[in-house]
């Protein structure tokens, strides 16, 4: 509790509104509430988060662990991004029922499509448990033993904290281990697909427009949460009924204007706002360039096949989008960090930090922090780069190698946990890979393998390369693997895993694809991971002390905890920006812009005929504005990955937009937030309603919602 009090006492209530930051919703009273009201907010902090009555937090569930969603009707209807629902849409798609291309709309509840393993998680309460988690930790000197004690305490408090039988407890760390918070949650496992526009709307602009502005993408999809007859979470059942939410968001028909207040709630995944300059230099100069080059090579191969074959396009659409998303983000991030002189600004802060350490007489506690950071980042860099090559080539972007690595992990389970654990893992692996092989094409992956293994062998630090990557003729090596390995089709894969543990391990050891993966994984496990983890543990300990020092030495600064996939609030205004000299981007776009980008037959910029007809007839209904149809808008809200699908609400708490991206120039906000160029991109809710109503003819979904005119009161 003392860190909560310290955190609140650190700040002087400011009369001038500020922006930026990802704030814990249970701690908004005081500085944050004052700032938001100065920006124009009309509701209170208690309206945003409360355990005593319904609040906005009850309408913002975590969507499948990686995105955000919002409840928009009293019947459990939720809204998220098209790209967040993409896997579900793809899984229900086939050549005969191509929902990716044509869209999908359930015209009655009986038509809504169930989705195995898709969950949404609601927050019931947020509780500080710092004292319980850090009990008995201060006297421990070993960093490893300290973390073990913390984990032991987390296990205890998770098990003992009061909750209902259908609820779950989860503890997360904040401020680099200086604060711990327990979330009581409800996880709903019956989530059904209700509607999704065609990809020509939901992914309009695709990879060319990704991370950029102006934008004209209708990036949304709709699902419905189902519960048992007690309104509690339950596995899928035909007897389940639509979930009755504690709160749902009214939808504004009045739209936005520049300088309007906006607030975004969601589950941002990861930020690193308090890194030292040495870490930022490593990102800009070492790790980002390596990851960008690897993914660019994989994307080039996949794109070539997808443009020639529609079946491959369906198979690889979601995978391609996933690879491209962070490839482009890393490019923009690196450019933004350079443009904003983030390294130089960090260095200036570090000079000031050292002076404050001396002035406060804290040399013994904090005097060597920066020198130690420099030492350890210098030591860890070759290991970090090697780690990225292994993860990007083997674990993530070459499918045969990724599958082989799962078998490697299976073998390790047998070695460390025995045959029963092996059998359990094996059965789960066989079952889960059915979907993998449905969307796997060996010809495509062989070419990806050829390109990426060549990069691994020629660009990764030479001192950490295994023998299997030395002196390899890549164009001959790839066919020799793919023509002989049993990891290229489901039937052979299942046969490979038939039998007891010893029989399976013997069979996979003889597979050429697995043998190659094992050589890479053994090398990584022996020569890279241990030393990386050892140094990284020291860096993490330094970062925790560095964070504590900043909280102590900068009591009047706006310090918020880095994102960690927990519910946060960020606020700002609808605002345009200037990316470069003589250019200013307006904060709103219209359907006119999509038509201007229209390229008939192009997979990125084609437009459905019906949408063109609606545009030509200006048939916008109640969703138009001065004869035009709003599509997207931008704001100064501080967002990141995980905020996809987040609701953007107005001053009264009404839904005005759906967050789905950031502008390319500002993607470095994960590391360095610059309010002059950092903008989040949102779909205007009027465009969402227009597509549902006028384009899809799903008026019944509109009728479920509460449409309001807050500006006309």
Swiss-Prot record:
The record marks 662 as: Is essential for the Asp/Glu P1 specificity of DPP11. Pfam families: Peptidase_S46. The active site is at residues 83, 219, 644. The keyword Signal applies. Residues 1-17 form the signal peptide. One of its GO terms (molecular function) is dipeptidyl-peptidase activity. GO terms for biological process: peptide catabolic process; proteolysis. The keyword Protease applies. Its EC number is 3.4.14.-. Keywords: Aminopeptidase, Hydrolase, Protease, Serine protease, Signal. Belongs to the peptidase S46 family. Catalyzes the removal of dipeptides from the N-terminus of oligopeptides. Shows a strict specificity for acidic residues (Asp or Glu) in the P1 position, and has probably a hydrophobic residue preference at the P2 position. Preferentially cleaves the synthetic substrate Leu-Asp-methylcoumaryl-7-amide (Leu-Asp-MCA) as compared to Leu-Glu-MCA. This is Asp/Glu-specific dipeptidyl-peptidase. It comes from Flavobacterium psychrophilum (strain ATCC 49511 / DSM 21280 / CIP 103535 / JIP02/86). The gene is dpp11.
């Amino acid at each position: 509790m003392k860190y909560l009090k310290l955190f609140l006492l650190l700040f002087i209530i400011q009369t001038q509104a500020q922006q930026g930051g990802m704030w814990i919703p249970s701690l908004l009273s005081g500085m944050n509430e004052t700032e938001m009201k100065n920006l124009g907010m009309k509701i209170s902090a208690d309206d945003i988060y409360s355990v005593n009555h319904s609040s906005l937090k009850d309408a913002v569930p975590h969507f499948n662990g990686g995105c955000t969603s919002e409840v928009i009707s009293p019947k459990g209807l939720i809204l998220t991004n098209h790209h967040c629902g993409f896997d579900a849409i793809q899984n229900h798609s086939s050549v005969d029922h191509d929902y990716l291309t044509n869209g999908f709309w359930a015209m009655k509840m009986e038509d809504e499509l169930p989705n195995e393993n898709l969950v949404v998680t609601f927050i019931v309460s947020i509780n500080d448990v710092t004292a319980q988690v850090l009990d008995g930790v201060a006297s421990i000197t070993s960093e490893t033993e300290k973390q073990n004690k913390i984990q032991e305490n987390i296990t205890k408090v998770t098990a003992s904290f009061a909750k209902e039988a259908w609820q779950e407890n989860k503890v997360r760390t904040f401020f680099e281990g200086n604060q711990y918070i327990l979330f009581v949650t409800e996880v709903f496992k019956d989530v059904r697909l209700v509607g999704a526009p065609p990809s020509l709307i939901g992914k309009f602009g695709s990879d060319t427009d990704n991370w950029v502005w102006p934008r004209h993408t209708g990036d949304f999809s709709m699902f419905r949460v189902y519960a048992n007859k007690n309104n509690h979470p339950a596995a899928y059942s035909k007897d389940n009924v639509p979930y009755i939410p504690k709160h749902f968001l009214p939808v504004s028909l009045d739209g936005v204007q520049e300088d309007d207040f906006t607030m975004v709630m969601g589950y941002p995944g990861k930020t690193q706002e308090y890194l030292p300059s040495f870490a930022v230099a490593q990102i800009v100069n070492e790790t980002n360039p390596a990851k960008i080059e690897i993914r660019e090579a994989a994307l080039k191969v996949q794109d070539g096949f997808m443009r020639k074959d529609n079946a491959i396009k369906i198979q690889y659409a979601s995978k391609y989008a996933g690879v491209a998303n962070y490839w482009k983000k890393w490019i923009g991030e690196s450019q933004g960090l350079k443009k904003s002189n983030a390294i130089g600004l960090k260095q200036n802060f570090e000079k000031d930090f050292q002076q404050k350490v001396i002035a406060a007489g804290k040399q013994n506690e904090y005097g060597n922090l920066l020198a130690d950071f420099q030492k350890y980042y210098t030591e860890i860099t070759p290991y970090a780069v090697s780690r990225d090559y292994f993860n990007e080539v083997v674990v993530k972007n070459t499918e045969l190698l990724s599958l082989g690595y799962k078998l490697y992990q299976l073998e390790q389970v047998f070695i460390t946990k025995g045959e029963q654990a092996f059998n359990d893992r094996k059965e789960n692996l066989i079952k889960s890979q059915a979907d993998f092989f449905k969307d796997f094409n060996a010809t495509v992956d062989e070419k990806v393998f050829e390109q990426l293994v060549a990069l691994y062998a020629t660009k990764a630090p030479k001192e950490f390369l295994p023998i299997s990557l030395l002196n390899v003729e890549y164009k001959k090596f790839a066919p020799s693997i793919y023509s002989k390995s049993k990891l290229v089709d489901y039937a052979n894969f299942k046969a490979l895993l038939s039998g007891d543990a010893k029989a399976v391990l013997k069979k996979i050891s003889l597979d050429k694809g697995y043998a190659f993966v094992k050589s890479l994984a053994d090398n990584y496990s022996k020569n890279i991971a241990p030393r990386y983890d050892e140094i990284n543990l020291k860096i993490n300990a330094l970062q925790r002390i560095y964070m504590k020092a900043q909280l102590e030495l900068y009591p009047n600064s706006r310090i918020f905890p880095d994102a960690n996939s927990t519910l946060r609030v960020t606020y700002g205004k609808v605002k345009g920006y200037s990316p470069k000299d003589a250019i200013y981007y307006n904060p709103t776009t219209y359907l006119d812009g999509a038509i201007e980008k229209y390229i008939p037959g192009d997979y990125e910029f084609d437009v459905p005929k019906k949408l063109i007809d609606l545009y030509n007839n200006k048939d916008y209904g109640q969703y138009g504005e001065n004869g035009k149809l709003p599509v997207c808008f931008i704001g100064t809200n501080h967002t990141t990955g995980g905020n996809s699908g987040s609701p953007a609400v107005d001053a009264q708490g009404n839904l005005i937009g759906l967050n789905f991206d950031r502008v390319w120039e500002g993607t470095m906000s994960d590391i360095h937030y610059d309010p002059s160029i950092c903008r989040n991109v949102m779909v205007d809710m009027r465009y969402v309603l227009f597509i549902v109503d006028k384009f899809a003819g799903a008026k019944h979904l509109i009728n479920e919602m509460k449409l309001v005119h807050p500006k006309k009161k």
